[in-house]
Regions:
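Redox cofactor-anchoring modules in respiratory/redox and cofactor-processing assemblies
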Residues: 1-189
Length: 189
């Protein structure tokens, strides 16, 4: 098993490709395989245009399409680039899907699933969802500085992996899709 894959991440990994791929399914793939090969050759490309992928479930990183050519199926490589490989399921985000809506969904998920034991998880998830609720309704813009402080507090202060890791995909979206979301954001002084 250790001879399969690469030195950093040995063995194989089950990778689940969603229905946006021409060849959706679960594949056992050698660690170290280029993501480009997994998506284009094994997955057969995409049925419709996509702009990003959430890899590794709701706590996994959101990887823009432009970064796929630069990644291999490797835990350390994903982490070094600010993503998380996790269990390697791949959820495609369509080109026309709002990233503000996607972040709202992530906060909604963590607010619903939080155990409620710690303040950063219980209140942070709810406050994040509330910020995006108001932006959706058009009643308020999201204060970017406050959002970033909330995400750092959740990363550092949450007791469980759920609420402590949910900032990773949100930070990925803010980094790679910030321009798309500028109408929902309020720059702080």
């Amino acid at each position: 098993f250790a001879t399969i894959g690469n030195k950093k991440s040995a063995g194989t990994k089950l990778v689940c490709l969603d229905s946006f791929f021409n060849n959706p399914g679960v594949y056992e793939i050698d660690m170290g395989t280029p993501m480009k090969k997994i998506f284009n050759e094994i997955g057969g490309g995409y049925k419709e245009p996509v702009k990003a992928f959430q890899v590794g479930g709701p706590l996994g990183g959101v990887v823009p399409l432009s970064e796929i050519d630069n990644l291999n199926l490797d835990f350390q490589e994903f982490t070094a680039k600010g993503f998380m490989l996790g269990h390697a399921s791949v959820v495609s985000i369509p080109k026309d899907f709002s990233m503000s809506e996607y972040i709202h969904h992530l906060f909604e998920f963590s607010a619903e699933e939080s155990c409620g034991k710690c303040f950063p998880g219980r209140l942070g998830s709810y406050r994040g969802k509330e910020m995006f609720d108001q932006a959706k309704k058009g009643t308020a813009k999201i204060p970017l500085k406050l959002l970033n402080e909330l995400l750092v507090t959740m990363q550092k202060g949450c007791l469980c992996a759920l609420c402590g890791a949910i900032p990773t995909p949100i930070m990925n979206i803010l980094k790679y899709f910030g321009d798309e979301m500028k109408n929902d954001m309020m720059k702080d002084n």
